[in-house]
């Protein structure tokens, strides 16, 4: 049976259809917003997965190119692995949903959001979060708290709900807010240096607008939602919990109070070894339960330390940033390098400058077709002192790379100001919390070292949160380290400049964040950011005046778009000859902007000269240095510009009478000539006599 429900959000219809498609899924819905449509299927395993200590939720965001009327490129002509954007969108759906499942729920759950139709005014990634929540709420899976998502734009001083494509172009803010009825669950933002108070008001605006979508979901559930199954929730047996607590709590507490990281880890390893020795014979089938009991006690000790004792594991004040180190120019042959160290977290970012032709071409369902600035993030096992096979980037690495990329995007100079493709690679050398924000700082250092004229330096910091079980007590922490991230309740990453915020990413392990926590985290991040920016400026106060001598040399020139065909030539003959003769790369835009780049500046100069010659118009009255190409009885033919030839009649060759042309010039000679006339057929008449006369007059005046 097909059920439908509809509402209006920001003047556009939002609709859900349930029961028509995917009959064998626990719940399958078709959810639309305008002409953007997402098919969402959710399913859960019948039984919990044995031997695990986590909730096995997987979220897939599947892009279908037919949704935008495209056929995939390449030989195979079908969608391949998910695009980076699809991976990021999948992560964004996962983060607000995961904390709202019951604690101890270990059934495998899969949420698949398939994008089947896209209208550019209505972003599929925002609709997908709402669709995932709606499908889970309508299903028999024990998920009962609706989550809503909206995008907030800012044009002038006005907040825009779910901005259209045109409004997004004008907006200085791209903010996604996910919320339940009571609290904010997730924040993603990119902005053009947005002031803190404006960002807080934008989040409040988004939270309020989420309530209409939550009401819409609740109405749908009351009308045609399935009855919820009673979940089989995993809980550590009371007997085991009490036994482990009695044996190990004091040892765990003592170990967790050690401020030095290595000593603390060594002490905890000893405690765990003693626990295993004590209980492995008595409870051989419950070692994962024992591990969970130890984790819960560690978390309890850390919470007590922070909330009741007012101490952090490493002895810092709640608003204190770890020691900062900044260095540039480490690698001799790269175009720019930045090394950023914060405590035991260390990231080296390397900048590479390339020609405009080296932009990344995107083949996806989004409006963006190419990227000129990109940031990649690598997190090898050695950064945490572990041994693992080296593989390609995972979802986390793609997410962290995109976050640091977004933080600096508003500060990158335009193509006209800086005609280079820019690639940054952040290598995490040591990780003890907040490597993504260390990558922002390392990227700033590398860009400045590479001579990229960024608008202003940027820095990032991660704020954390510790709460009591009933959420009545809350403490916001500045610059969380690994332990505080692991046992904490929030990861609130903020990057920006002295002027304002350029990116935010927030996720939580609890059922949402209060208004006070968001306010304190944003303003606490500003205080820390300004301190880090001072350290960056001490290291390198401004971009280097010139790019590295190893970077490609680039020049731009504007030509008449009508002349593009002259530069390219029939079948690319002319442009290919220029490239072959000078060793340059040439990129020509439709508006006639030409980019010429090469490792050698001489090649660039030569190519620019040729292109200028090909596109420059010969003007009557102008004097040119031309080359004699051919001699006839009646005069000499002279090339004044590439492929532009004129005739110097024998009577115009010299001030005195000339009997034979060869008496004055030979083929290959370079001579000054003046354009006396361009006739109706485009023929160019030249005079050497007039050019000599003008030159003599100029000499007399000097």
From Swiss-Prot:
It is an enzyme of class 2 (transferase). Transmembrane segments: none annotated. Its EC number is 2.7.7.8. Pfam families: KH_1, PNPase, RNase_PH, RNase_PH_C, S1. It catalyses: RNA(n+1) + phosphate = RNA(n) + a ribonucleoside 5'-diphosphate. Keywords: Cytoplasm, Magnesium, Metal-binding, Nucleotidyltransferase, RNA-binding, Transferase. One of its GO terms (cellular component) is cytosol. Its cofactor is Mg(2+). The keyword RNA-binding applies. CDD domains: KH-I_PNPase (cd02393), RNase_PH_PNPase_1 (cd11363), RNase_PH_PNPase_2 (cd11364), S1_PNPase (cd04472). It is found in: Cytoplasm. The keyword Repressor does not apply. Residues 552-611 form the KH domain. It comes from the Bacteria. GO terms for biological process: mRNA catabolic process; RNA processing. One of its GO terms (molecular function) is RNA binding. Residues 621-689 form the S1 motif domain. Mg(2+) binds at residues 485, 491. Belongs to the polyribonucleotide nucleotidyltransferase family. Involved in mRNA degradation. Catalyzes the phosphorolysis of single-stranded polyribonucleotides processively in the 3'- to 5'-direction. This is Polyribonucleotide nucleotidyltransferase. It comes from Clostridium perfringens (strain 13 / Type A). The lineage of its organism: Bacteria, Bacillati, Bacillota, Clostridia, Eubacteriales. The gene is pnp.
């Amino acid at each position: 049976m097909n059920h439908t429900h509809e509402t209006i959000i920001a003047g556009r219809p939002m609709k859900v259809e349930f029961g028509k498609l995917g009959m064998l899924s626990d719940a399958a819905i078709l959810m639309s917003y305008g002409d953007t449509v997402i098919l969402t299927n959710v399913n859960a395993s019948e039984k919990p997965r044995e031997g695990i200590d986590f909730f096995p939720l997987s979220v897939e965001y599947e892009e279908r190119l037919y949704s935008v009327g495209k056929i995939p490129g390449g030989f195979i002509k079908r969608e391949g692995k998910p695009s980076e954007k699809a991976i990021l969108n999948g992560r964004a759906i996962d983060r607000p949903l995961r904390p709202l499942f019951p604690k101890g729920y270990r059934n495998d759950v899969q949420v698949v959001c398939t994008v089947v139709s896209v209208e550019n005014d209505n972003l599929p990634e925002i609709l997908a979060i709402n669709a995932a929540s709606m499908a889970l709420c309508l299903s028999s899976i024990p998920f009962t708290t609706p989550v809503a998502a909206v995008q907030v734009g800012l044009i002038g001083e006005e907040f825009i709900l779910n901005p259209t494509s045109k409004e997004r172009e004008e907006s200085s803010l791209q903010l996604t807010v996910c919320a339940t009825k009571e609290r904010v669950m997730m924040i993603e933002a990119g902005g053009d240096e947005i002031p803190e108070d404006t960002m807080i008001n934008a989040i409040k605006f988004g939270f309020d607008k989420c309530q209409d979508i939550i009401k819409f979901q609740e109405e749908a559930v009351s009308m045609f939602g399935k009855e919820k199954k009673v979940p089989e929730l995993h809980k550590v047996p009371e007997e085991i919990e009490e036994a482990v607590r009695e044996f190990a709590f004091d040892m765990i507490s003592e170990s967790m109070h050690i401020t030095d990281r290595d000593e603390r880890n060594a002490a905890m390893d000893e405690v765990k070894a003693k626990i295993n020795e004590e209980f492995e014979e008595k409870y051989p089938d419950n070692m994962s339960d024992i591990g969970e009991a130890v984790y819960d006690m560690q978390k309890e000790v850390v919470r007590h330390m922070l909330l009741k004792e007012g101490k952090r594991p490493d002895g810092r004040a709640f608003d204190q940033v770890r020691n900062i180190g900044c260095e540039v120019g480490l690698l001799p042959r790269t175009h720019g390098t930045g090394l950023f160290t914060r405590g035991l977290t260390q990231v080296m970012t390397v900048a590479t400058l390339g020609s405009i032709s080296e932009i990344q071409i995107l083949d996806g369902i989004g409006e963006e077709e190419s990227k000129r600035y990109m940031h990649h993030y690598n997190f090898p096992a050695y950064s945490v002192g572990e041994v693992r096979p080296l593989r390609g980037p995972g979802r986390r690495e793609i997410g962290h790379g995109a976050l640091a990329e977004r933080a600096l995007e508003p500060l990158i100079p335009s193509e006209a100001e800086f005609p280079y493709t820019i690639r940054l690679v952040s290598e995490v050398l040591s990780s003890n919390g907040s490597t993504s924000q260390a990558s922002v700082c390392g990227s700033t250092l590398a860009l400045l070292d590479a001579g990229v004229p960024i608008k202003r330096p940027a820095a990032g910091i991660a704020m954390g949160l510790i709460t009591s079980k009933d959420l009545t007590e809350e403490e916001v922490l500045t610059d969380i380290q690994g332990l505080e991230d692991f046992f904490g309740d929030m990861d609130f990453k903020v990057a920006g400049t002295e002027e304002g915020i350029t990116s935010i990413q927030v996720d939580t392990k609890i059922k949402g964040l209060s208004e006070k926590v968001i306010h304190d985290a944003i303003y606490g991040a500003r205080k820390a950011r300004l301190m880090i920016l001072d350290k960056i400026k001490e290291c390198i106060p401004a971009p280097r005046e010139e790019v590295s001598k190893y970077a490609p040399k680039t020049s731009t020139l504007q030509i008449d778009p009508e002349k593009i065909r002259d530069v390219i030539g029939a079948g690319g003959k002319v442009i290919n000859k220029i490239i072959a003769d000078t060793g340059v790369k040439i990129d020509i835009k439709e508006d006639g902007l030409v980019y010429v780049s090469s490792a050698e500046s001489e090649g660039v100069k030569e190519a620019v000269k040729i292109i200028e010659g090909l596109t420059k118009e010969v003007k009557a009255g102008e004097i040119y240095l031309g080359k004699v190409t051919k001699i006839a009885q009646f005069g000499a033919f002279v090339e004044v510009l590439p492929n532009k030839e004129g005739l110097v009649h024998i009577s115009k060759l010299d001030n005195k009478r000339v009997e034979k042309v060869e008496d004055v010039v030979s083929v290959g000679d370079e001579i000054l000539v003046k354009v006396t006339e361009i006739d109706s057929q485009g023929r160019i008449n030249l005079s050497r006599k007039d050019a000599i006369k003008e030159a003599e007059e100029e000499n007399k005046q000097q």
